[in-house]
């Protein structure tokens, strides 16, 4: 059996201003729920997704009206845009012409070779990657006849077949997804895919369900896959506001230490010792830090006796007591604050630390740019 390709060993593929694969961080994606031809509504939803932390967004392109809207949408957003194409290769060509950053197709349902070749040539000319979207629910008839039902081996065979179509046309800017609604099937398919090729993998549990059930199902499946070192980009598929997909994705990546651009909340489960309204405070603080783009850890704890010690890794936190709270940094108490202002004081400290982290990150970026410049001049 081939060795599994770790996410850091996959081929880097450019998508707009991002690079997926290689040594780059996992990228969070989502998909709009609007009619793509409704530019105003689509842009408004994408703006909300951007604010929530979405890094790549996909839109359905079922008809010419949607394809013609791509250029207008692109002008008004800040993140890479992906066109989801099925059956009609001409829609892919129009989307590419409109400035799309990536095309998601299934080469098997685009039609004859000359149609696939037309899409590949257009993508190659513009430097646009193609995602091959394998789905357990829409495998080719001959694969289902061979295996009897959707299997991980059948999904990998489908992926390899489609990859070969593109490779035969000398196209290698490829990303692959192996989606299934069955968690165990998805885990097996992604693991076998990581052994079969080194293209970046887009992760997802398709049709996972409503906000609550879908979150649990996606976390179970994608968590197991991520823990194996597999995956370069992911989408949480929920029957909910797509902003919720982004929130869940950020939390999932933070749980595995795979997001350096997201804040983390640590809070205790409450008990009879608590003298403050911990649940509402934790929810308020979680909402406050939800859009921060720095890896700050914030703790909200109910017990002033054990709190600071239990959250030593937190950059900043509060531990409640009767009528007051302890404000602490890295497990060390900084000062006592009255209960009525402790949340506001915590927010002030969060702002200071977040600003420091952001400034430090900018310094690191400048250093990297200087190193690159020196390397190019040598």
Curated annotation (Swiss-Prot):
GO MF annotation, one: 4 iron, 4 sulfur cluster binding
Pfam family, one: GcpE
Residues reported in the UniProt entry to bind [4Fe-4S] cluster: 268, 271, 303, 310
EC number: 1.17.7.3
Spans annotated as Disordered: 359-378
NCBIfam families: ispG_gcpE (TIGR00612), PRK00366.1 (NF001540)
Protein name as catalogued: 4-hydroxy-3-methylbut-2-en-1-yl diphosphate synthase (flavodoxin)
């Amino acid at each position: 059996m081939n060795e599994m390709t770790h996410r850091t060993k996959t081929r880097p593929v450019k998508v707009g201003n991002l690079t997926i694969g290689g040594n780059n961080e996992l990228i969070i994606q989502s998909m709009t729920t609007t009619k793509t031809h409704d530019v105003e509504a689509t842009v408004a939803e994408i703006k909300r997704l951007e604010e929530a932390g979405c890094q790549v967004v996909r839109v359905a392109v079922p008809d010419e009206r949607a394809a013609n809207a791509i250029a207008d949408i692109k002008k008004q957003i800040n993140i890479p845009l992906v066109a989801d194409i099925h059956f009609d290769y001409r829609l892919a060509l129009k989307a590419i012409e409109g400035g799309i950053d990536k095309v998601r197709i299934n080469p098997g349902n685009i039609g004859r070779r000359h149609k696939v070749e037309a899409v590949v040539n257009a993508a190659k000319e513009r430097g646009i990657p193609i995602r091959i979207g394998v789905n357990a629910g829409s495998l080719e008839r001959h694969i289902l006849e061979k295996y009897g039902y959707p299997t991980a081996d059948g999904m990998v065979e489908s992926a390899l077949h489609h990859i070969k179509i593109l490779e035969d046309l000398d196209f290698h800017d490829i990303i692959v997804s192996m989606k299934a609604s069955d968690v165990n099937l998805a885990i097996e398919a992604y693991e076998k895919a990581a052994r079969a090729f080194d293209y970046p993998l887009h992760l997802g549990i398709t049709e996972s369900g409503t906000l609550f059930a879908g979150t649990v199902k996606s976390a179970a499946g994608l968590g197991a896959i991520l823990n194996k070192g597999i995956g370069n980009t992911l989408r949480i598929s929920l029957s909910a506001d797509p902003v919720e997909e982004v929130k869940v994705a950020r939390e999932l990546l933070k749980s595995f230490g795979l997001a350096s651009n997201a804040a983390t909340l640590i809070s205790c489960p409450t008990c009879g010792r608590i003298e403050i309204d911990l649940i509402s405070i934790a929810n308020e603080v979680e909402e406050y830090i939800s859009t921060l783009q720095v890896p700050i850890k914030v703790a909200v704890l109910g017990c002033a006796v054990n709190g600071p010690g239990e959250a030593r890794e937190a950059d900043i936190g509060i531990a409640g007591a009767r009528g007051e709270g302890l404000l602490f940094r890295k497990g060390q108490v900084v000062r006592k604050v009255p209960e009525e202002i402790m949340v506001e004081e915590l927010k002030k400290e969060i702002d200071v630390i977040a600003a420091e982290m952001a400034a430090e990150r900018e310094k690191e970026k400048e250093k990297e740019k200087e190193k690159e410049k020196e390397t190019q001049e040598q």
